[in-house]
């Protein structure tokens, strides 16, 4: 499974490390991802999705049922 948030679609991006002498070496910026269980009241079961910290805030704001309708990947 690739490293991306199933709610917001955040993925890892590439960039540069910069030393004091401004030498550039490639690196990846990884999203803050967690596997989290959410209770679906309509189905009376938990689902487990990979979600970023911002994705959890979106779910808290909009509700899990609204977010499931617009998932980047089906659960």
From Swiss-Prot:
InterPro entries: Ribosomal_bL28, Ribosomal_bL28/bL31-like_sf, Ribosomal_bL28_bact-type, Ribosomal_bL28_sf. This is Large ribosomal subunit protein bL28. Keywords: Ribonucleoprotein, Ribosomal protein. GO terms for cellular component: cytosolic large ribosomal subunit. HAMAP family: Ribosomal_bL28 (MF_00373). GO terms for biological process: translation. GO terms for molecular function: structural constituent of ribosome. The lineage of its organism: Bacteria, Pseudomonadati, Pseudomonadota, Gammaproteobacteria, Candidatus Palibaumannia. Belongs to the bacterial ribosomal protein bL28 family. The gene is rpmB. It holds the Pfam family Ribosomal_L28.
């Amino acid at each position: 499974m690739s490293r991306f948030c199933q709610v917001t679609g955040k993925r890892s991006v590439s960039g540069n490390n910069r030393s004091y002498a401004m030498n550039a070496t490639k690196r990846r910026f990884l999203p803050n991802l967690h596997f989290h269980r959410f209770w679906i009241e309509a189905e009376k079961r938990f689902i487990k999705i990979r979600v970023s910290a911002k994705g959890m805030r979106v779910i808290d704001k909009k509700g899990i049922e609204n977010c499931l309708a617009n998932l980047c990947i089906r659960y």
